[in-house]
């Protein structure tokens, strides 16, 4: 029977049955293979780590159905659907659920031979892609990525793919930096941000980076990040904090002439929507230019969802790619 994961309240998660109708015209019914947990966002939501009046507060209403990055197998198609057929693998913005009904126009075809565990990353890669577009990378660029969680991992890979000469990654959790090295980081640091400036400049020949990516979603990082960009540099905020009133400007904005850009998942532009970016991500992974090897650290059965979220809360340093395996669901 189809099933899904639901948050019924703060730190309350359950696996419950559900029903779905047959696909209508233009729709596709798919059976999930894997859904990837967005461990940063879902940690904020699960633990209600956000302030009243924030966009998280406006978004999270119970029952809340988490998840937004699914890879699935097509089961049936509705009238008029010609681009997909039963047996095809697709990626889409599916919740943590065994089955989904999706408009065909919103599905990303997954190439034959692409591991579904890699394809499950597509939505997080798309979020980081928005940040890469906002960064306006140049060939030979110098980039600092703050935070080596899932969004930071995707961010550094886009910077590498865009031709940056130096992609430096900092995170206090050393285990995460091993994933960054495999993704193409040219140097990693695990020191606090207030101790980073001197070694960072030494790494970059006496200069600070032109682009700083804050992927953390931690309110205290913003002020520190402002001091790590070169004069007239760019700070791109991808990490989505639940406490935006605690993010503060510093004098570096004026004295250094910095450009600050917020980059959010919803910022589609010039045709770069979910499907187009998803297809591009798949091509990049398949070509070897976007290394996604060994990114899954934890796999859970949907019925073990309480254990999954407890594990992610307790193992922030070792959890990276956390997936629910729906492949055995009926």
Where are these regions (language model features)?
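C-terminal hydrophobic helical "lid"/dimerization subdomain
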Residues: 223, 231, 277-330
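A glycine-/small-residue-rich N-terminal strand-loop-strand element
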Residues: 69-93
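Glycine-rich cofactor phosphate-binding loops and adjacent beta1-alpha1 units
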Residues: 178, 183-261
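Mid-domain Rossmann-like dinucleotide-binding core that forms the NAD(H)/NADP(H) cofactor-binding site
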Residues: 115-193
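N-terminal glycine-rich cofactor-binding segment
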Residues: 7-22, 39-71, 91-93
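C-terminal substrate-binding/catalytic core of Rossmann-like NAD(P)-dependent dehydrogenases/reductases
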Residues: 198-202, 206, 247-296, 307
